[in-house]
Each structure stands twice: as C-alpha cells, then as structure tokens.
Amino acid sequence: MQDPKVVIALDFDVKKDALDFVDRIDPSQCRLKVGKEMFTYFGPEFVRTLVAKEFDVFLDLKFHDIPNTVAKACIAAADLGVWMVNVHASGGEDMMIRAREGLAQFGQDKPHLIAVTVLTSMDKRQLSQIGIQSSPMEHVLTLASLTKQAGLDGVVCSAQEAAMLKETLGKEFMLVTPGIRPQGSDVGDQKRIMTPQEAMQVGVDYMVIGRPITQAKDPVAALDAINVSIA
C-alpha cells in the first residue's frame, strides 16, 4: 500500500503486549501512533524500535509550551525518525512557527508537523467552561486557520469538521482524525465519531483508530477489513 490511511493508536501499558501486537502488523498496511501514556512508560527507545521495524510513527505528544521549548521538543522527535509530530494550536502562531523552523534542518526527512485544534472529547458546554463561547466547529476553524497561517502541514480534527476545513483551507491542508469507529464498534470516550468510509468521503487524509483494531479478536483481519472498506 503506497500511502496507508489508517494510523493505529497503540494504547498498551505493557511493552511486551505492544511489541507482540506490532509484530503481527504489516508496516505497509498502516502507520502507528504513540501517545503520552506509552511514551511515558516506554520512552524514546520504544519509538526507535518501531521506526527500526519500518513503521511510520506519529508521535502524539501535543507539545504546548513556550516557543523555544516546543521547537526543541519537535527537533528531538525528528531525531527519533518519526513520520509525524503534533503541537497544540492554542499555543499560538509564534510557537507553531518556531516548531516549523526547528524542523527545517531535517530537509526532506523532516516529519509532518500538525496541530491539535479541539479535542474530540470536548463539546460546547466544556468549551464554555474554559472561557470559549464559540461552538466546537467555529473554534476548530479559528485554530486551523491559524495553523495554516503558521505554515504547518495540517491539523488534528474531528471528521465532522473535515469537509468545512478542506473547503476553507484547501485540499493540500492535511487532516488527521481520531474518533473513527468501524460500523458496530463501541464509541468509547469519543463524542464526535464517524466510520472510516464516511471519513474518507468528507476529506480526511489519515484516520486514527485504536481499540477496534488493537482489541479485536483478529487485529490483522480488522485492519484488512478497514483498508478494503476505504480502497
């Protein structure tokens, strides 16, 4: 597969379980996401192991700090050989620009740099509680527009915002979407969800899928079924 669209969220708290799972999966059929829990448990060496197994790794640590600190963190991620790294758009334009500039030294090998807009667990009530009166959709557009202005590759967003973002910010602006659940899956803690087929139809570039694959009785078959459904 030339450009796998499925990014499997590796949410394991035992390294052996994670590696056993990874060894069953073909790196040409998917990419892998390592988030805060696994990175805290297993550290950067685990990421290097995945890269050595020829997986494209999305390091999902959502950096959000002063510009210099975030730039250095992104450089450290690139040194691990990751395919993609992200920051919080709410950290501001200067922070995002510094992150992008920090990665320029890696040339063609630099990872994709994307920004988180509104977490998929957030709804209008929760946004209001932190002082944001706009709807999730409006706030996503504000932060995504700022991200494009800063020169980043794209954003993490919910599938419901994808069509609007592609129309407003252009087809080249990359959309990475969690909250994707194959038909019949448990929705878990994601409030804004969509099936893989629906996500592709509205312009999602890469879909993050965790438990429907990692907790399936046959993870390889589950991944294959998703890939077939979006081919």
Curated annotation (Swiss-Prot):
UniProt cross-references to InterPro entries, sorted A to Z: Aldolase_TIM, OMPdecase, OMPdecase_AS, OMPdecase_bac, OMPdeCOase_dom, RibuloseP-bd_barrel
What does the entry list under GO cellular component?
cytosol
Biological pathway: Pyrimidine metabolism; UMP biosynthesis via de novo pathway; UMP from orotate: step 2/2
Which residues participate directly in catalysis? K62 (proton donor)
Keywords of the record = Decarboxylase, Lyase, Pyrimidine biosynthesis
UniProt xrefs under PROSITE patterns: OMPDECASE
Give the EC number: 4.1.1.23
Q: List the disulfide bonds.
A: none
Q: Which GO terms describe its biological process?
A: 'de novo' pyrimidine nucleobase biosynthetic process; 'de novo' UMP biosynthetic process
Q: What class of enzyme is it?
A: lyase
Tell me the domain of life. Answer: Bacteria
Q: Where are the transmembrane segments?
A: none
Give a GO molecular function annotation for the protein: orotidine-5'-phosphate decarboxylase activity
- Asked if the record carries the keyword Iron, the reply is no
Binding site residues for substrate: 11, 33, 60-69, 120, 181, 190, 210-211
The protein's annotated catalytic reaction(s) are: orotidine 5'-phosphate + H(+) = UMP + CO2
Q: How does it assemble?
A: Homodimer.
Q: Which family does it belong to?
A: Belongs to the OMP decarboxylase family. Type 1 subfamily.
What does this protein do, in the record's words? Answer: Catalyzes the decarboxylation of orotidine 5'-monophosphate (OMP) to uridine 5'-monophosphate (UMP).
Name recorded for this polypeptide: Orotidine 5'-phosphate decarboxylase
Q: Which gene encodes it?
A: pyrF
